[in-house]
Amino acid sequence: MSKAVKDIDPNAEIFGPALFGYGAFTNFADAPDWKEIKNDNPEYKWFIDYYLDEMKKAEDENGRRLLDVLDVHFYTEAKGTCGKRYCEHYGDPDCVYNKLNSTRSFWDDTYTEDSWITDAGAEFLPILPALKESIDTYYPGTKLAITEYDFQG
């Protein structure tokens, strides 16, 4: 698709893949073929690495950049003090604080969110430095966009 767009407008910026959250970043939402790809390519720490590397290979084959912006979505998985992920206690200062504090999952390596992500290891939190590292390793020059997010704040 990006080749067709670039054929019509070489200056168009192509965004992709618009992954929906942490599970999609790490293992493409448990796609069955991802396990085989990962086993055959242990250098890929997560799906983002594989995607960027494949886009770089496609650029090399086509002689032009086919992905301009790595596009991801991120939604907090952090729980409020009530223990719920989508806490609706908007009048409870502690729940509101936890929701607003969860934005730190983007950038703060001293922050540990209370969620299934940290229970599973949180290898790629904070998310922005992890994404930037993958870009720098597999497809330098790619921009980054978080085009959808929700922190329930």
Say what each PLM segment does.
Residues 1-153:
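Noncatalytic carbohydrate-binding groove/subsite architecture in carbohydrate-active enzymes
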